[in-house]
């Protein structure tokens, strides 16, 4: 990210002075747990009746005043929007009975928590958040798909930090996300429920997307991973965050911004 005029408080960034931290405070964990139990049980029952996917929410990362990661010639927000809209078009064409909802369908800013709210209020069966990766090293390449979980590696943490930095554009981010720490002991309660209710479906969705990105879009497969993404932790359905490729890599940037590349990426996700 090239924008950072405001800095997050230390509790938002530092765990032993290095890791991104948004703490699951004791005051928050119980209401969140209760909310998730009731919300997820309802959604799980709906999915178990016939297994049909009736509503999919497609989330184009960043937007408006938040450009996302910057390539040499294009901002992440433009790529994610183009691909997200194409994903929706493919789903509508091939699965006319499935309703597609976008968290944004033009270049405007949407807070991370509102993206999850859109999915929850519409009782979505799937939530797919679309992003582009970036690295200080321009040699990194490939696609990877994340599910909500613990920061099991420094690399996963860095990706989460990159995407979570979108909160810097939100006026009330300190109060809105106070209490979020995927690595806090209290979080095990939430992740335990997550695993029992829809983590398995999220992993299955992520695995399918990765396979298709490799087969259809010829993307190097960086695998299915988990990390603490703010945009995922409030969703009450199977949800994934897709990193299409590295916008910091010139070759991948050229593919990501090309019409042909976007068509292939969208088709892979929609499959």
Which residues make up each language-model segment?
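Short, intrinsically disordered, low-complexity terminal segments
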Residues: 11, 41-43
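Compositionally biased regions
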Residues: 18-20, 28, 40, 240
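Bacterial N-terminal signal peptides
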Residues: 25-39
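Catalytic-core regions of hydrolytic enzymes
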Residues: 44-180, 195-207, 211, 263, ...
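Active-site-adjacent mobile loop/cap segments within catalytic or ligand-binding domains
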Residues: 68, 187-271
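A short, terminal or domain-edge coil/loop segment
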Residues: 150-164, 182-190, 224-232
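Flexible hinge/switch segments at interdomain interfaces of large molecular machines
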Residues: 177-185, 241
